[in-house]
Regions:
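Long, low-complexity, Lys/Arg-enriched
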Residues: 1-103, 111-348
């Protein structure tokens, strides 16, 4: 097994690996530790002690089970441009890099969106383009996500960029002159405390129609209502969102989010086809679970030569609520495992 995780201060960094190893079995387990820096001025640098603690825990967990290999990701080009998503997409370039393993596990619990989205897409692409009787057909690809909505709210984006960008490789078709006149439909997955990001993405996309996604049902039955209250003036007064345009999906089921968003896109494509076509942009501003659902939508449509954009706003780092460090030595929440490709997947 190859276990892939990102280095960081998030207390969930090693929880998935710990649960997996404690479940038993003596098979070989190697780890790939993704390393990246948001810059010397990043507020995340203040939590270096938490990072060291997580790395020490990783080394202790691995013990004699296998090796730990570090793979760096560049977040900025020489010109100062953000290239994290493109770098993440190039982390693995060939299916043969997974030779000797039966399972790949990617734990995104402590991984930024700009890194895990293109990385998931790249691994799926490597597996899908591999012939049925070759190495890729024998690999299982699993995704681990430790969901803790309270902790997510306590880790805030700091230094949000002034403009939004499209996550590589989901955005190249959005600015084509040949389709400039096509209506744009924007589908943002709403989460708490994301007003600046919503405003910047709206400025990038300039949509003709907006279909916000609300987490409902949710562990907190009023979470969807609270999000509507939080963004009421933005959604209804400024962006003129129609109440009938809201999409609802369970906050703990990315495959339901996938189905609901896919259904909405197909409906709009059929309705707008007399106008010469349409464009769609997704924005995952919610939990990692729902973000995965949005990514799978874009991935599957791209496989059929239909480009779906994913718009995102980068940040300079993250701020961790100090009370969390003092009062929450242990994480709450729950580990989710998604089996995205492998033995169950008949690709013939």
């Amino acid at each position: 097994m190859l276990f892939i995780l990102a280095k960081g201060f998030d207390p969930r960094m090693c929880l998935g690996l710990e649960k997996l190893l404690n479940a038993g079995g003596n098979g070989k387990c190697d780890a790939v530790l993704i390393e990246f820096s948001e810059g010397t001025s990043s507020p995340s640098n203040a939590y270096w002690q938490l990072v060291d603690k997580n790395v020490a825990k990783l080394e202790k967990l691995m013990g004699q089970r296998g090796t730990i290999a570090s793979r760096p990701i560049k977040t900025h080009s020489k010109e100062g441009h953000r290239i994290a998503s493109r770098s993440a997409s190039n982390l693995f370039k060939d299916i043969n890099e997974f030779a000797g393993y039966t399972d790949i596990v990617l734990d995104i619990s402590a991984t930024p969106r700009a890194v895990y989205m293109p990385l998931i897409a790249k691994i799926l692409h490597l597996l899908d383009k591999t012939p049925r009787n070759s190495l890729g057909a024998q690999l299982n690809f699993h995704l681990f996500v430790w969901e803790d909505s309270d902790l997510d709210r306590d880790i805030r984006d700091e230094g949000v960029e002034e403009s939004a960008v499209y996550v590589h490789p989901y955005g190249g078709a959005m600015d084509r002159e040949a389709t400039a006149g096509q209506p744009k439909v924007w589908i943002p997955l709403l989460g708490e405390g994301q007003r600046p990001q919503l405003e910047r993405i709206h400025a990038l996309v300039v949509p003709d129609e907006i279909c916000p996604v609300l987490p409902s049902p949710a562990l907190n039955p009023r979470r969807g209502d609270n999000l509507v209250v939080e963004y009421h003036d933005l959604l209804f007064d400024r962006l003129r969102v129609e109440p009938r345009n809201f999409i609802y999906c369970s906050e703990r089921n990315p495959f339901e989010a996938y189905r609901q968003i896919t259904r909405a896109i197909r409906g709009y494509r059929n309705s707008l086809s007399p106008l010469g076509g349409s464009k769609f942009v997704l924005s995952a501003l919610s939990s990692k679970l729902l973000s995965v659902g949005a990514l799978l939508v874009a991935y599957d449509f791209k496989a059929t030569n239909i480009d779906i954009g994913i718009a995102h706003v980068e940040c300079h780092g993250y701020y961790l609520n100090e009370t969390v460090q003092e009062t929450r030595p242990q994480c709450r929440g729950e580990l989710f495992g998604l089996w995205l490709a492998g033995e169950w997947d008949d690709r013939d």
